[in-house]
């Protein structure tokens, strides 16, 4: 049987309750509920669905949102790749979970 993986990424850890971040935070919470719903819908199939919270990652979007932040002091994209690799293995049993890709 072929296992199919679906990942949704969402970073809501620090967005909740921040002034002027309401629409952004609401969209991230909505993604979390959507992933849980999708996971329930495909529970009896070979599809695994998980939400990955990458935490702060040095991206262009983050640099624009947080000017002056030292991009070298936060995770780099390659730092979180292992989380996605681990979730996509045949031995991974996680389904319908919110997984943090950072320490």
Segments the model singles out, each with a brief description of its role:
Residues 6, 49-52, 62:
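Hydrophobic structural elements of the Rossmann-like NAD(P)H-binding subdomain
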Residues 44, 51-52, 59, 67-103:
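C-terminal helical subdomain
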């Amino acid at each position: 049987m072929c296992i199919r993986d679906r990942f949704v990424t969402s970073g809501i850890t620090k967005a909740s309750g921040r002034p002027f971040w309401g629409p952004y935070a609401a969209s991230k919470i909505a993604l979390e509920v959507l992933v849980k719903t999708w996971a329930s819908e495909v529970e009896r199939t070979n599809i695994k669905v998980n939400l990955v919270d990458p935490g702060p990652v040095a991206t262009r979007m983050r640099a624009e949102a947080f000017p002056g932040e030292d991009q070298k002091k936060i995770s780099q994209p390659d730092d979180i790749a292992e989380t996605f690799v681990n979730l996509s293995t045949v031995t991974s049993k996680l389904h319908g979970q919110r997984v943090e890709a950072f320490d």
